Amino acid sequence: MAQRIILAFDKFKGSLSSAQVAEAFARGWRCVVPDSDISIVPIADGGDGLLGALSSHLGAKSHDVVAHDPLGNTITTHYATSGDTAIIEMAQVSGLALLNAEERNPLLTSSYGLGEVMRDALSRGAKSMILGIGGSATNDCGMGMLEALGYRFYDAEGEVLEASGDAMCRVARIDVANVDARLSECDIVVASDVDNVLYGERGAAWVYAPQKGATPAMVEALDEGMRRFAKVVGGEWHNVAGAGAAGGLGYALMALLGATLKSGIELVLDTVGFDAMLDDAELVVTGEGRIDRQTLMGKGPAGVLRRARSKGVPVIALGGTVEWCEELASSGFERIYEATPEGMALDEAMQQTTAQQNICHAAMRIAREWLLLHS
């Protein structure tokens, strides 16, 4: 029986945080094997949840800040600092989840709030930033963020533009005279698992804007706007993998702020020293709310699996739901389990208390099976 196990769960989206999933699993496991040494390692893949995952590992201090949401409404959001490193999650201030379905329009939304949070971090002495840019509501090529940091944008007539997806389509000149000088002394690492280029069929607008409320006509306008914006900026950053992340924010961060893009899950695992944790581990359990083909494409559990297998540590996966496919069958997971009982409605299964109970019961079943196989 495994005496030391690592629980490295991503969130069960819309239901439980990664820590809550792991705690529920640990309760169930200890019902069967009470003397197990269990380490909980919350993970995230660059989307929402990165702030919580890194903050818990680093003992980071949380800061509230007043900023603007994607439509310009004033909100109170938060980020964290560990030493002189700021950890910022775009979804907390410029996220799609902040808007209801009727409000989602990437011609109108702006990443300005993200820039405000970054500016606040600079004021607190940040010399480096880790940005999680998943879950965005925007498709403005980072114009809003840049505006909040001192960039100014003008149209062909010399009129000042207020950043938005629509304004991006009319940019003719960028003024950098008032850009926050502290940015030149700040290293920015972007956690993102999106490898799309800026524009074209694999670009931000065509692939992601429809999820943010864009009609086909909007998609065409936004894609053309990104081409225009990239022409004004110059260079070849638009062809770099990840430029299309967060509606072109990845492009702005690389091309204008000198940021480095890194796989979200790899960044988290490196930050927490996951490889060293594996040295005396006998089992790793990972998972997310829905396990399917996409799980293997840069998601958190896939990163955990890759690291653990390189050390010869077996990995079990647990999903709230599982959509079986050939890729999962040959992925290398020791076993893949589903927490939701057969016949239970998804809405019921996602209720927090029910989800915790389902995970706890699944953990008991997994522990018993593991005990039978390894006793």
Question: What do the predicted segments below correspond to?
Answer:
Residues A2-I133, A137-S375:
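N-terminal loops that bind phosphate or other acidic moieties
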